[in-house]
């Protein structure tokens, strides 16, 4: 799988890619990353990437030309024509945005990446979406900045907009790293299967509490059952604690799980109330 990130600050990604689980994914041949300085694709005198918004307003908006050039130079699906600032001026904006529609529909053999724009206006990322994205052959993540990205880029190239939460950051670089990490770690072999299967959200609920040495600190002890060696009791304890944590911290997840998973509902009733049908 290949993931490309279009950013104005590629150096943000360098250390993370070289020292984390993402590096392991590279070494195992599970992932390929391309961190692109999108400014390199600008076609103006000073490689300017931002400009004032039409209609007025605070802040600056990322210009569209560099994104057009990136996609058309790197993917046959979009054609090869480079654009400069003048190409997007005047009354021909619509034509430029749609000029390759026939080309795309008639040439499906040309690869098309799945393109994501990370933005607080997108749908909130969850484990199910990460699993879905991990099945794609190639992703391109657009990392925004300033007040936003020219809407024509979204209309032309972006397949979906994704948010990592209902708050605003200075740029899309951190959300892009979140996507890189969350997708890479579930690729087969990158982490142990046992670790992946005990992650929060894997089974629709949060993960169970973890403990390590020492057994006691300042009066707080590791639960005795975890030291018993009885694996059946340990599994039951962990499952119950995971449910309790989900009810406490993410009641929405618990209620969804109860409604959609009859087996889980019966297990919950038996574990907490001794009911068995």
Regions found by a protein language model. Name each.
Residues 215-277:
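SAM-dependent methyltransferases
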Residues 63-139, 145, 188:
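S-adenosyl-L-methionine/SAH cofactor-binding core of RNA-modifying enzymes
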Residues 1-75, 227, 233-252:
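N-terminal nucleotide/polyanion-binding subdomain common to many enzyme families
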Residues 186-225:
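Internal, active-site/partner-interface "lid" segment
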Residues 127-129, 152-154, 209:
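Short, well-ordered secondary-structure micro-motifs
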Residues 4-6, 34-36, 116, 139-140, ...:
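Hydrophobic/aromatic beta-strand patches that form the interior of the parallel beta-sheet core
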Residues 8, 38, 118-121, 143-145, ...:
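Fold-independent oxyanion-binding glycine-rich loops
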Residues 149, 153-192, 196:
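Structured adenosyl-cofactor binding patch, chiefly the S-adenosyl-L-methionine
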